[in-house]
Amino acid sequence: MKTLTPRNWLIALLFVPIVALSQTVVLTGKTESKVTARVFNPNVLEVTDDNGGWFTNLEMQQLGGWDTPYEVQARLRVVSMNKTFQVRLDDPLTIRNQSNPAQVFRSPNVTLGNEGGEQKVLSVGRNTQFSNPEPPEDGVDTVGHYTLAISAYPPEGDFRSTVGAYSGVLSMTFEPVVKAP
């Protein structure tokens, strides 16, 4: 009679799972389930120019005399799932002379308002709310048109001392206002 060595035991153990896998398992009871899910559209807030893009440069003009501000306006299109959204400036608007950074425009003012409506002043750290018109039907995004207006007075000094190319960066945040359920 042969004795089983540890090697033979290992070989015998290798065949045990094969025997266990060959067993038939019978399932009884409920074998199907119905799963339902609700998919919600993500909250959309898209701000563009009229052509679906964005502005690369807005050129300010001084239409009055030397003591009048330089101004520019831009038309914005706001598409939103929610009717209400809020806007704030990320940083104060600073318009500097590219050759002489010490020369800056004074009292910059940034406003936004419904097209043809009252303009609201935008500022850093303060959210200002706006509302798009009602959508034409339920489940459709609202679309509103707004006028962005920027104005600032030229730097102190005469025309000869302040002449030059000026630039600045306008950084704003648009956020949807979410209602609690």
Provide a role label for each language-model segment:
Residues 1-3, 22-29, 122, 126:
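A detector of low-complexity, intrinsically disordered, Ser/Thr/Gly/Pro/Ala-rich segments
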Residues 2-10:
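Bacterial N-terminal signal peptides that target proteins for export
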Residues 4, 15, 131-134, 174:
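Selective for proline/serine-rich intrinsically disordered segments
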Residues 13-22:
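Hydrophobic h-region of N-terminal signal peptides that target proteins for export
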Residues 18, 43, 134-137, 177:
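Generic low-complexity segments that are intrinsically disordered, proline-rich and/or Lys/Arg-biased
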Residues 22-104, 142-181:
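N-terminal small/polar-rich segments of proteins
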Residues 90-149:
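Surface-exposed, polar helix/loop patches in the mature regions of secreted/periplasmic/lumenal proteins
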